[in-house]
Amino acid sequence: MNYEFEREIGFINSQPSLAECLTSFPPVADTFQSSSIKTSSLSHSTLIPPPFEQTIPSLNPGSHPRHGAGGRPKPSPAGSRGSPVPAGALQPPEYPWMKEKKAAKKTALPPASAAAAAAATGPACLSHKESLEIADGSGGGSRRLRTAYTNTQLLELEKEFHFNKYLCRPRRVEIAALLDLTERQVKVWFQNRRMKHKRQTQCKENQNSEGKCKSLEDSEKVEDDDEEKTLFEQALSVSGALLEREGYTFQQNTLSQQQAPNGHNGDSQSFPVSPLTSNEKNLKHFQHQSPTVPNCLSTMGQNCGAGLNNDSPEALEVPSLQDFNVFSTDSCLQLSDAVSPSLPGSLDSPVDISADSFDFFTDTLTTIDLQHLNY
């Protein structure tokens, strides 16, 4: 009994829901189709029915399934249709001419703002046509085609410019009539030609000034180089002269130092002397006459005679060479010391030797040299 009662209670409690499900099946299909169409773009899965609570009208109080089903699709097309209308009314379509030129954009904005939302497209079309006309008119007025002059026209204009850079009005009218040009074209051409001439003259002046500056700089550099060269040559000449003087004084000092000890030493030093150097030394020492000159000559003559008379080779060798060396070293140095205390004085003094003494001296020297060579 209890089982049957519970079964009946459950059947009674579940019976209204089944009936409502059966009665609400057609609207559920409508809503299912509309929802599946919307969600098909998002998910490509199989068709899934909506939740059970949304399909039951009893769970949604104050709404009938038919009214709800019939009322839901109505606002959706209204919303979809009404959404572009305010967008079109608030934002009129933008054309490329509106972006490029400001004047056309300003003329197009007042009718668009004054027009209603429903008739927004009409004024836009009208303003577009008007703006195109305005743009064409403004473009034609502001942009002028460049005048293409012929060769004859340019030649005549250049000739006139060569004689007159500024034209008076009668002459300008005459040239325009001759060349089939307007007065304005002739005027503009002369203005442009004057500017060109001015630029050319300025460029030439700048080039000339630059060339002069470069030439001045080059000349200054050349002068500086010449001055440096002259200074360098002067320094070299001065240094060369100083070196010559120092070398000359050094030679004099060395000669005086070598001859001074030889003159003071009493012992005779025997060393071989070449004939040429002995002649030069004897000539230098016999520049000044002194009382010792005859003694030197007599001793040299006696020694030479003794050497010539002796036939033995030893006598020829020893006495003659020793006597000649004694004459060349001791007697001549004593003579130079007696005549002048220093060597430069004796070197710079004039020659006072007589012709007879010079011939005698050269003859004796040649005989001694010949004997020495024969031996």
Curated annotation (Swiss-Prot):
Q: Is-annotated flag, keyword Nucleus?
A: yes
A GO CC annotation recorded here is: nucleoplasm
InterPro entries in the record: HD, HD_metazoa, Homeobox_Antennapedia_CS, Homeobox_CS, Homeodomain-like_sf
For this UniProt entry, what is the primary localization, expressed as one broad class?
Answer: nucleus
- Keyword list, A-Z: Developmental protein, DNA-binding, Homeobox, Nucleus, Transcription, Transcription regulation
Output the GO biological process annotations, alphabetical, semicolon-separated. anterior/posterior pattern specification; brain segmentation; cell fate determination; cellular response to retinoic acid; dorsal/ventral pattern formation; embryonic viscerocranium morphogenesis; middle ear morphogenesis; motor neuron axon guidance
Which residues does the annotated region (Disordered) include?
Answer: 41-93, 197-228, 257-278
DNA-binding region as annotated in the record: 142-201
Q: Which SMART domains match?
A: HOX (SM00389)
Q: Which cysteines are joined by disulfide bonds?
A: none
The record's subcellular locations are: Nucleus
The family line of this record is: Belongs to the Antp homeobox family. Proboscipedia subfamily.
What job does the chain carry out? Sequence-specific transcription factor which is part of a developmental regulatory system that provides cells with specific positional identities on the anterior-posterior axis.
Name assigned to this protein: Homeobox protein Hox-A2
- Record organism: Callithrix jacchus
- Gene for this protein? HOXA2
